[in-house]
């Protein structure tokens, strides 16, 4: 099992475009790709899946125990597949205490690191920058760079000359191209399912990467570098039930692949339904999962989805365990106020009203401990990222005691009423990550 980490000195360097192009270009050459994304991001993995035709797992070195990282990598990269993981932020960026960096992930999984460097505003300084990133730790290896946003032949010559003096291989040089940019929304890039020109974008990125990069050298590096260690399966989050109905469409797209895989490994059967298509959960399901997404963009449609609403209430009445995360939590509430102030009725299964008219960013890693064992039976790691505000809340049991990445107590969060529960936290792993 071979693997690469596509990293950068900072966000905005072009990692996603290069990664998508590289994945598709290698796939064209018959390389079996196992896509991955470092960190808790939901949006990039959907692009990776579109580029490769394979599900994309997240690898979060802060929120996941090393044994889970190794187990997931061993699973997806088996059978000769090449694991290509896109990093988050900069190579050495992590939580406030410096933990959970992409470099940590490279060290844990034995991934060769290729740096994508935005060269638009530098020339010879690139050598000092890259050498500093490469030498910062001795337990990882930066094997080369892909230079992005290069302005001219002369600019390229200066960059190559500087990097040659510090013996840093250049695997590719991409010229500036404003056409190859993905649109963004408040939680990051626009979702793959909403990007009508996505296939054309990926094909264009692949053509650029194939023309500008030494794919044979990149593939060779992935092959000869120390391999991703084989690993036995790890303890995983317990399934919500034996037959779990999962909401899946562009309003409920933020669902971790490793979570679904873990539930299946735990013996659960999973079915999918689309609230936006006015579908309810499988009537035989003993658990329902509403993941996060952008329900605020589809609040009117969800409010009017009679079969969805009826099916969810029927599930609650028969005692099925219903769990909503972030956007799913908001939909379980009584109402959702859109950015323009319009209120839409939601399911009314939990006593809260959320609003995007009073925006406030909530962002960070969390450790959560269940207040009782009705839904979950031990401490877990999670991530929170949303702009919604709770503007009304009724009586219900609290779900979690929450602390942040630094261990600061954030109080209790989330609600539970009978078989229905939810919170803004996206659950990632059982506790134990550093």
Curated annotation (Swiss-Prot):
InterPro entries: CbiA/CobB_synth (IPR004484), Class_I_gatase-like (IPR029062), CobQ/CobB/MinD/ParA_Nub-bd_dom (IPR002586), GATase_3 (IPR011698), P-loop_NTPase (IPR027417). Optimum pH is around 7.3. PROSITE patterns: GATASE_COBBQ. It is an enzyme of class 6 (ligase). GO terms for biological process: cobalamin biosynthetic process. The record marks 426 as: Increases nucleophilicity of active site Cys. The keyword Iron-sulfur does not apply. Its EC number is 6.3.5.9. Pathway: Cofactor biosynthesis; adenosylcobalamin biosynthesis; cob(II)yrinate a,c-diamide from precorrin-2 (aerobic route): step 9/10. One of its GO terms (molecular function) is ATP binding. Residues 243-434 form the GATase cobBQ-type domain. It catalyses: hydrogenobyrinate + 2 L-glutamine + 2 ATP + 2 H2O = hydrogenobyrinate a,c-diamide + 2 L-glutamate + 2 ADP + 2 phosphate + 2 H(+). Keywords: ATP-binding, Cobalamin biosynthesis, Glutamine amidotransferase, Ligase, Magnesium, Nucleotide-binding. Pfam families: CbiA, GATase_3. Its cofactor is Mg(2+). Comprises of two domains. The C-terminal domain contains the binding site for glutamine and catalyzes the hydrolysis of this substrate to glutamate and ammonia. The N-terminal domain is anticipated to bind ATP and hydrogenobyrinate and catalyzes the ultimate synthesis of the diamide product. The ammonia produced via the glutaminase domain is probably translocated to the adjacent domain via a molecular tunnel, where it reacts with an activated intermediate. Belongs to the CobB/CbiA family. Homodimer. Catalyzes the ATP-dependent amidation of the two carboxylate groups at positions a and c of hydrogenobyrinate, using either L-glutamine or ammonia as the nitrogen source. To a much lesser extent, can also use cobyrinate as substrate in vitro, but the physiological substrate is indeed hydrogenobyrinate, as part of the aerobic pathway for cobalamin biosynthesis. This is Hydrogenobyrinate a,c-diamide synthase. It comes from Sinorhizobium sp.
């Amino acid at each position: 099992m071979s693997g690469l980490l596509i990293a950068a000195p900072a966000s905005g360097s072009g990692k996603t475009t290069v990664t998508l192009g590289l994945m598709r270009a290698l796939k064209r050459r018959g390389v079996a790709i196992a896509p991955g994304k470092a960190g808790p991001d939901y949006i990039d993995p959907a692009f990776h899946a579109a580029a490769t035709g394979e599900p994309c797992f997240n690898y979060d070195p802060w929120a996941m125990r090393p044994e889970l990282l190794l187990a997931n990598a061993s699973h997806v990269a088996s059978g000769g597949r090449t694991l290509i993981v896109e990093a988050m932020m900069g190579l050495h960026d992590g939580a406030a205490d410096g933990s959970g960096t992409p470099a940590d992930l490279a060290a844990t999984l034995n991934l060769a690191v290729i740096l994508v460097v935005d060269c638009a505003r530098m020339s010879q300084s690139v050598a000092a920058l890259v050498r500093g990133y490469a030498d910062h730790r001795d337990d990882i290896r930066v094997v080369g760079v892909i230079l992005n946003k290069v302005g001219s032949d002369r600019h390229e010559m200066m960059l190559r000359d500087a990097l040659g003096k510090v013996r840093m291989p250049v695997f590719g040089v991409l010229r500036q191209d404003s056409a190859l940019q993905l649109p963004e929304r408040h939680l990051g890039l626009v979702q793959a399912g909403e990007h009508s020109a996505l296939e054309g974008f990926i094909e264009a990125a692949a053509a650029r990467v194939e023309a500008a990069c030494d794919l044979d050298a990149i593939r060779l590096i992935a092959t000869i570098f120390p391999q991703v260690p084989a690993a036995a399966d790890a303890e995983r989050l317990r399934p919500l039930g034996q037959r779990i109905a999962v909401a899946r469409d562009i309003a409920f797209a933020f669902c971790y692949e490793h979570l679904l895989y873990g539930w299946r490994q735990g013996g659960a059967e999973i079915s999918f339904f689309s609230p936006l298509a006015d579908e309810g959960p499988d009537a035989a399901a003993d658990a329902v999962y509403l993941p996060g997404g952008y329900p605020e963009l589809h609040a009117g449609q969800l409010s009017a989805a009679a079969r969805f609403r009826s099916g969810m209430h029927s599930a609650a009445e028969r005692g099925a365990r219903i769990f909503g995360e972030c956007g799913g939590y908001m939909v379980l509430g009584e109402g959702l106020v859109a950015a323009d102030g319009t209120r839409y009725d939601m399911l009314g299964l939990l006593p809260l009203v959320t609003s995007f008219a009073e925006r406030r960013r909530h962002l960070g890693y969390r450790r959560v401990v269940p207040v009782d064992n009705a839904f979950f039976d031990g401490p877990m790691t999670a991530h929170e990222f949303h702009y919604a505000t709770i503007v009304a809340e009724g009586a219900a049991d609290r779900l979690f005691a929450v602390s942040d990445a630094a261990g600061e107590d954030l109080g209790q969060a989330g609600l539970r009423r009978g078989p229905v529960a939810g919170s803004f936290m996206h659950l990632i792993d059982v506790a134990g990550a550093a």
